[in-house]
């Protein structure tokens, strides 16, 4: 769509001339920083999104469409804070004096993240179409470059990353550097979907193939199995929504709900039927360790199935659970019980239902959202802790990217609706 179209002008008018330009500046800043942080410092996604949220506060306008998912997340954060009253975790100082003290207050961090990340997601939905299209294009091309760089670096044993690291003056083993390179694949796996939609409208399949190949090669060499699984599952979701439309999207809602409801039961049934024991014999060491963690978590969920053990309780079980359960649904059940798992499940089902509504207008955009959503959930189900700041921030960034990727598409009559939450 032409940037001077009535739709684009309406979006700019709603935000105000100064506000619209400022949002465009913030969007460019975020997309330029994204590939740099993905490669050099993935933990930096947390401060990036927090800063973006603060920067857009003057332009923030809460809408009715954003209210339901935000209220669900507020309820989840409140329940998490309440659960601290019975959590076995020893709290830090009630009056934190430095960042180390804040690190121990997960409930406070969650509230701050919801405020800042949420502000970034909601405010950047008001980007004028021309600014969103520009930012989306920059991000897409930058991700292609990142995929090529990481693939080359992985094949060279992280030699490029080690060159950058010498600036810090600290030594790093090549195997550790390769692990650092692998972290970029998580951003690539999530942002592949909006980037591929943008590239498909501009250059056809060539750059998309390059982006996908670079991500797969890096994931394979660095043993980033979670990203390979995410791309496969996301690809299935993409195909289902792209070719079945609303029917496929409705099936997706059910598929997303199932793990939040049945995760502990599935593990316990697997133990009772001997499936878990069989998997222990078949899977490599890293997955064998996950099975042990999941079995332990499912067993302990039975002690407090409704209220859970309390926020951050996963950290208190010693070697049985190193830091977290490596499964988002089980961690929610273990720490926040059925209440927390239900709230999180409702939120993600709300997002998935947004894909159903989006499929009415554009199957390609709905398929993009489905692929990104499923990829995030798959990685969260086998790799990271639910409360890790950078991982939550990367999820928020994926929302923003999916919204921007819709600019210039065939269905932009509802330009304010940039994300599947609309």
Model-identified regions with their sequence ranges:
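A juxtamembrane structural motif centered on a specific transmembrane helix
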Residues: 1-25, 203, 360, 397-422
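N-terminal signal-anchor transmembrane segment
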Residues: 2-62, 76-92, 376-380
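Alpha-helical transmembrane segments of multi-pass inner-membrane proteins
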Residues: 28, 115-119, 133-165, 176-243, ...
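Transmembrane alpha-helices of multi-pass inner-membrane enzymes
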Residues: 28, 49-55, 236, 369-379, ...
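Aromatic-anchored transmembrane helix interface
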Residues: 75, 93-125, 137-138, 143
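A membrane-periplasm/extracellular boundary helix in multi-pass inner-membrane enzymes
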Residues: 152, 239-285, 295-302
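Long extracytoplasmic/lumenal interhelical loops at the membrane interface
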Residues: 279-336, 355
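Hydrophobic transmembrane alpha-helices and their immediate junctions
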Residues: 338-377
């Amino acid at each position: 769509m032409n940037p001077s179209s009535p739709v684009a002008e309406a979006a700019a008018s709603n935000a105000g001339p100064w506000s619209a330009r400022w949002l465009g500046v913030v969007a460019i800043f975020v997309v330029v920083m994204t590939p740099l942080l993905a490669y050099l410092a993935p933990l930096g996604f947390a401060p990036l999104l927090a800063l973006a949220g603060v920067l857009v506060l003057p332009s923030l306008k809460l809408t009715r469409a954003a209210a339901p998912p935000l209220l669900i997340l507020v309820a989840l954060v409140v329940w998490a804070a309440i659960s601290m009253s019975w959590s076995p975790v020893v709290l830090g100082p009630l009056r934190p004096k430095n960042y180390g003290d804040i690190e121990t207050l997960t409930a406070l961090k969650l509230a701050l993240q919801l405020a800042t990340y949420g502000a970034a997601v909601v405010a950047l939905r008001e980007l004028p179409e021309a600014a969103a299209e520009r930012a989306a294009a920059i991000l897409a091309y930058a991700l292609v470059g990142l995929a090529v760089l990481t693939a080359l670096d992985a094949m060279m044993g992280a030699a490029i990353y080690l060159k950058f690291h010498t600036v810090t003056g600290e030594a790093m083993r090549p195997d550790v550097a390769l692990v650092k390179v692998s972290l970029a694949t998580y951003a690539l796996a999530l942002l592949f979907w909006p980037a591929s939609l943008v590239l498909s409208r501009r250059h056809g399949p060539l750059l998309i193939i390059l982006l996908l190949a670079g991500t797969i090669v890096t994931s394979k060499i660095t043993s980033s199995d979670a990203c390979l699984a995410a791309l496969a599952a996301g690809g299935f979701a993409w195909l289902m929504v792209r070719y079945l439309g609303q029917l496929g999207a409705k099936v997706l809602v059910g598929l997303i709900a199932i793990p939040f409801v049945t995760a502990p039961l599935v593990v316990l049934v697997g133990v009772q039927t001997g499936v878990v024991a069989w998997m222990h014999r078949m899977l490599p060491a890293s997955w064998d360790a996950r099975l042990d963690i999941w079995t332990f978590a499912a067993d302990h969920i039975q002690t407090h199935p409704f209220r859970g053990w309390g926020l951050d309780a996963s950290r208190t079980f010693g070697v049985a659970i190193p830091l977290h359960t490596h499964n988002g649904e089980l961690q929610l059940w273990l720490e926040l019980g059925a209440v927390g798992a239900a709230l999180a499940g409702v939120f993600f089902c709300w997002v998935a239902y947004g894909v159903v509504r989006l499929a009415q207008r554009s199957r390609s955009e709905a398929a993009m959202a489905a692929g990104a959503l499923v990829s995030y959930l798959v990685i969260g189900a086998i790799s990271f802790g639910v409360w890790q700041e950078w991982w939550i921030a990367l999820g928020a960034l994926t929302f923003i990217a999916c919204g921007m990727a819709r600019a210039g598409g065939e269905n932009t009559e509802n330009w304010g609706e940039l994300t599947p939450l609309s």
